[in-house]
Amino acid sequence: MALKIRLRQQGRRNHVVYRLVLADVESPRDGRYIELLGWYDPHSTVNYQLKSDRIFHWLNQGAELTEKAAILIKQGAPGVYCELMAKRMARKAAVCQKRRAYRQRRSLKRAEAKQSVVN
């Protein structure tokens, strides 16, 4: 079951309000959700309210963000977003380091093989 943090549309015709929810990928846009993580009202002066601790929890559990939800979280809970990006960058750096070490070992083996063929 893949999970996404996304916006769920609420409200009336000319006054749309969104809820930030954790939902299964296969559920419809305005359908069933697992947990309410906040809300966003584009028409109000107080635009949004987010539960940053719960968002952080679900992101650590492997939930993915949609583009619009990421923008909203970046504005409303910048600490959560920065920590998420730091973890992603650390993970990428670790993968790059493993690949670099593998390439180095492979080139050394090839050089040794060439050397043994020459001798």
Swiss-Prot record:
<dbReference type="InterPro" id="IPR000307">
    <property type="entry name" value="Ribosomal_bS16"/>
</dbReference>
<keyword id="KW-0689">Ribosomal protein</keyword>
<keyword id="KW-0687">Ribonucleoprotein</keyword>
<dbReference type="InterPro" id="IPR023803">
    <property type="entry name" value="Ribosomal_bS16_dom_sf"/>
</dbReference>
<dbReference type="GO" id="GO:0005737">
    <property type="term" value="C:cytoplasm"/>
</dbReference>
<dbReference type="GO" id="GO:0015935">
    <property type="term" value="C:small ribosomal subunit"/>
</dbReference>
<dbReference type="GO" id="GO:0006412">
    <property type="term" value="P:translation"/>
</dbReference>
<dbReference type="Pfam" id="PF00886">
    <property type="entry name" value="Ribosomal_S16"/>
</dbReference>
<dbReference type="GO" id="GO:0003735">
    <property type="term" value="F:structural constituent of ribosome"/>
</dbReference>
<protein>
    <recommendedName>
        <fullName>Small ribosomal subunit protein bS16</fullName>
    </recommendedName>
</protein>
<comment type="similarity">
    <text>Belongs to the bacterial ribosomal protein bS16 family.</text>
</comment>
